[in-house]
């Protein structure tokens, strides 16, 4: 992806952002952002969306300032519209079509020609762009609400790519795109000659970025190279951080041993001095003064040691903050294991109400790991719900022989007003409380999280909680049905969930457009949608 070095499009000077509570979300940030492609990563809640809005000029920084040289087009993650909003209005180009219509009717206004400067061919370009994106012909009067979630994303992206903007600000653009939609976006970015800052956890997309920015609460750090290079640099940083922590701990242990020796020696000298003073032929006031000084020396040394200990403890804490926690291993109950050859699921001439195509005859035997593939709208979610009995089939039957659990991207089976512990208790977990707390701690779900309402916890924590609830209930889960589980997770949470799911000993049926996530699950089969029906492939 060749993008030449250019002058800065944005300059950030001591930019900070505060929440309504007065707490600082991030900053101060200092950065020069050139007109090239750049990925933006960071944990959920750190402020990636807020940073994009600051760069777009939609929000103002709490302090500092942003020099904005480039014209921008911003595509938000959430798309808000009124029910009667047309496509032309939604994309901000209604003025073009209104002016063209007036001119065609011979009712043009004085400023129409000026307003249309550079936009005369926009209808043709929009039409070509929409067709290339698989959206059909562009109809300016079509209601935007008639588009699906993935179609809305592609429509917004089409508008951005066809705009006169120098710089694109894209917030999780692949979240609702299927494989074909993602391939289209990757191609558009390959051909884009302007700059772009793209907040994303899509590793395939980030692999195409020549630069990665990582946002933390304290800084915006720049890494040259794509996502693979970023991972390597972060691993080197973590190796250095772990070495620094080990050195700090060793230094504290060595210093404590030295201080103990100094303390013991000081006490011996003080005791010897006191005994010597008692033998001296000196005035009583001198004796009192000398004894006071001898007794004070251990106290003075103790204060010095306390200050040194505080400095060493602070150094360890600072070093520990730079070390990231290892991804957890998900504990599973023995009952979750599925023996090879055991029938898990059998479909007999199954047809779905959503997509009444050729009947599906299929079965899952043993711990099969199956990817459910197909474009948006083909009926993948409908199939999962039909397998669980949440939705009746059009015809045919489904026979489920094991306990199954379903997790969708919204974790709709969770009551967000309840805590993790409350959910586990409702599931009648067989784990004793001590074991339960220990296993939750292994998932980085400590005492500070397990009693809080899920509504105040991040998406990654909620997903780990949901997995704990379905895997640690008394009736062990042997089949997991996962519907885009990583859609709203940051990279760190996605990696953690990958590792946890890789250990699951049962069967699995998963819907995801994240190829890296699917590879990490070590899939055995693929159930793929075709126009003529579903087909099964061994991987």
Region locations from a protein language model:
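Hydrophobic anchor residue at the start of the ABC signature
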Residues: 157, 467, 486, 497
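Conserved H-loop
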Residues: 202-208, 229, 515-520
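Conserved beta-strand-loop-alpha-helix hinge in the C-terminal portion
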Residues: 84-85, 89, 215-243, 529-539
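Catalytic Walker B motif of ABC-type/P-loop ATPase nucleotide-binding domains
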Residues: 168-172, 177, 185, 407, ...
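Coupling and communication elements adjacent to P-loop NTPase active sites across diverse families
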Residues: 2-18, 96-153, 236-354
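ABC ATPase nucleotide-binding domain signature region
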Residues: 37-38, 50-111, 366-378, 382-435, ...
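ABC-family P-loop ATPase nucleotide-binding domains
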Residues: 81-149, 409-478, 487
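Conserved beta-strand
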Residues: 12-15, 24-36, 64, 347-365, ...
């Amino acid at each position: 992806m060749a993008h030449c070095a250019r002058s800065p499009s944005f300059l950030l000077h001591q930019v900070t952002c505060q929440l309504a509570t007065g707490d600082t979300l991030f900053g101060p940030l200092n950065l020069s952002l050139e007109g090239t492609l750049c990925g933006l990563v960071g944990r959920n809640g750190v402020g990636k969306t807020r940073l994009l809005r600051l760069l777009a000029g939609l929000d103002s920084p709490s302090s500092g300032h942003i020099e904005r040289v480039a014209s921008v087009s911003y595509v938000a993650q959430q798309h808000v519209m009124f029910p009667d909003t047309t496509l032309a209005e939604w994309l901000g180009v209604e003025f073009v079509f209104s002016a063209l219509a007036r001119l065609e009717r011979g009712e043009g206004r004085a400023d129409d020609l000026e307003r249309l400067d550079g936009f005369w061919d926009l209808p043709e370009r929009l039409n070509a762009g929409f067709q290339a994106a698989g959206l059909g012909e562009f109809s300016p009067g079509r209601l935007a609400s008639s588009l699906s979630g993935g179609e809305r994303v592609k429509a917004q992206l089409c508008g951005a790519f066809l705009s006169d903007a120098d710089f694109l600000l894209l917030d999780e653009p692949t979240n609702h795109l299927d494989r074909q939609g993602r391939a289209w976006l990757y191609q558009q970015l390959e051909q884009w000659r302007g700059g772009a800052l793209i907040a994303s956890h899509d590793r395939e997309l980030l692999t195409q970025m020549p630069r990665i920015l990582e946002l933390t609460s304290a800084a915006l750090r720049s890494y040259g190279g794509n996502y693979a290079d970023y991972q390597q640099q972060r691993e080197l940083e973590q190796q250095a951080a772990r070495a620094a922590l080990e050195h700090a701990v060793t230094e504290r242990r060595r210093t404590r041993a030295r201080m103990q020796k100094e303390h013991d020696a000081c006490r011996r000298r003080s005791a010897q001095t006191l005994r010597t003073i008692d033998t001296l032929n000196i005035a009583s006031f001198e004796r009192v003064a000398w004894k006071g000084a001898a007794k004070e020396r251990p106290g003075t040394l103790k204060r010095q040691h306390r200050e040194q200990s505080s400095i060493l403890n602070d150094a360890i804490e600072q070093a520990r903050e730079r070390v990231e926690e290892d991804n957890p291993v998900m504990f599973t109950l023995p009952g979750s294991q599925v023996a090879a050859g055991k029938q898990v699921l059998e479909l007999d001439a199954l047809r779905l109400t959503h997509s009444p195509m050729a009947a599906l005859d299929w079965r899952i035997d043993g711990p099969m790991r199956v990817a459910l593939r197909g474009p948006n709208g083909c009926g993948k979610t409908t199939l999962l719900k039909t397998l669980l009995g949440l939705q009746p089939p059009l015809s045919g039957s489904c026979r489920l022989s094991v306990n199954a659990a379903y997790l969708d991207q919204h974790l709709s089976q969770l009551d967000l007003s309840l805590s993790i512990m409350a959910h586990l208790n409702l599931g009648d977990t067989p784990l004793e409380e001590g074991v339960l707390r220990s296993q939750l701690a292994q998932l980085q779900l400590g005492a500070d999280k397990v009693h809080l309402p899920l509504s105040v916890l991040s998406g990654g924590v909620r997903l780990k909680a949901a997995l704990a609830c379905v895997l640690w209930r008394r009736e062990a889960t042997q089949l997991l049905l996962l519907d885009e589980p990583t859609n709203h997770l940051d990279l760190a949470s996605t990696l953690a969930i990958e590792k946890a799911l890789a250990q699951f000993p049962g069967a699995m049926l998963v819907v995801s457009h994240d190829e890296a996530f699917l590879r990490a699950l070590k899939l055995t089969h693929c159930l793929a949608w075709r126009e003529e029906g579903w087909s099964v492939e061994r991987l």
